[in-house]
Amino acid sequence: MLEVSLPENVTVVVETGGATEWQNETVDPSCLERYVYQDEELSFVDSVPSASMGEASTLADFLDFCSTNYPADHTAVIFWDHGSGSASGVSFDEIYDYDSLTLDEIYNAFASVYELSEENPPLDLVGFDACLMATVDTASMLSDVASYMVASEETEPGNGWYYTGWLGALAEDPSMDGATLGTAICDSFQEGCEIYGTDDEITLSVIDLSRISPLLVAYDNLGREALSYACADPIFFSEFGRSALQSENYGGNTEDQGYTNMVDLGDLVNNSAALFTDTGTDVLSALEDCVVYKVNGPYREKSSGLSCYYSYSGNTDDFIQYASVGASDAFRYLYSYELSGSLDEDGIAYVSEMGYGELPEIPSLAEDGSGDYPLTLNDEGYAVMELDADTANLLKGVYFQLAYMDVEDDILLYLGRDNDIDMDWENGVFTDNFRGVWGSIDGNLCYMEIVYEGDDYNLYSVPVKLNGEDYHLRVVYDYSAEEFTILGARKGIDDNGMSDRNLIQLQPGDELTTIHYASTISGDDDFTPVEIDTFTVTENTTFEETEMGDGQFLMLFEMVDLKNESVYSDPIIFTVTDGEIEAEL
């Protein structure tokens, strides 16, 4: 930013806070400070006592300060640093127990300072230089606050927006409207990420908020159609769940990484086209109309510009946090029914108006007492799991879990979870594809867990220690290139729901330690993390499949049912001797 020479009619006002320390000697973390950047000079202009950046009153006070002291014909408000989607919001304050601004708090702050109007919104643009905030719910909240919104569906890399680029464009043409400014922000962001080598998974979009109302109507109608199908037959939840698992989702969404429960709206609707015969087309049309510009990396090619909530975690507490800010009543009742099996009084009244009375019970494989599912060996020696139609219809997804067995030392070393299975959903037949190979870094076997399964690529999470700190490597397998690539290292979602925006590129000389999970074979103890191999990153460090060598390996088929609960098959033991594989049930 400080590299841009601003004209006299462009002013940038900055408020600092929320950090225990800053990467400079200028900012005092003990209070909230305000700076003004004009021409080529950054000037300190004000300070106020320390307060949480996650409080609506703190934001409102800053907005009022700007409006009073620096009135302007055109105004943009930018939120910088950590975001975590619809449920947790933005601006996590590490001084005040990581308190964050929820969507309703953001709205209340704007409403206390400005006269809000969808026909004549007070702001030209609201931007989030933060992770995961390009959601339907965020856009709904801002519909009478600003003309345009700029935000990312995915976590942003640590380099963030390229302020030199878009502020430079604004300096050259201060008359530009919000759409043009948003486009400059997107293009310069992509340029900056390409410079830093962090562009593989980027997303950034410009939303015309004057066009958001038709999308909100279409989105709620989609929820009503989904709710009607679920009330008629809860098997809908498994069918919809399969579509969600195949859709581009953001921020991790695994037990190991944590959950944001955000999925691309367009990709979800496209993957659910066979389910939503009445409303899906309207959503896609309205979505295309309001997303006026976007950029995305090669491994975020399904990004449509806005995400929505889907309960990947299956956690009721996560949902309750979201429910108060969700843009659609219908989807709120849909997920409430899916997660709890019931609806509150308002929900019952809602579905009654739709013509539904008593809700059917949601079936669950985990609760029906069916136990482990038997396997057979086919003529080629592969393990086969055959499910009847009723059982297969309850499933959202099928995976396998793999572990190494050290019988002599009574150790079971968990290697991970993948979807490399021959799946015949129509006939309920699932066949293993064990080849005696697994993912490794420079020949060091890793724990790896699939986080996205697409037509063109899969994404994996690999827990490691990077220079002594816990991280997850983001690894992609590209089907066309037939190879793995390490995209970078990022920390998971923390206990406050805050995502990590720092995607770190591995550098020669970095120290990596692989993390696996181990238990005893004979006992019923839980898996605990263990450090296995420590090695140094080189210029030639690669992730690839490698032969695991001789030994015994245990595999289970994992079935995820429509309640997001997992049930497992009987185990199969693979014994590898001199490269030859023998299976035993």
Language-model segments: which ranges?
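N-terminal extension/subdomain marker
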Residues: 2-71
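Extracytoplasmic mature domains of secreted/periplasmic and thylakoid-lumen proteins
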Residues: 51-121
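Loop/turn elements at helix/coil->beta-strand transitions in domains of secreted/extracellular proteins
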Residues: 7-12, 70-76, 119-125, 144-148
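Membrane helical hairpin/interfacial module
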Residues: 24, 72, 83, 550-554, ...
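Short beta-alpha junction loops
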Residues: 16-21, 83, 130-132, 154-156
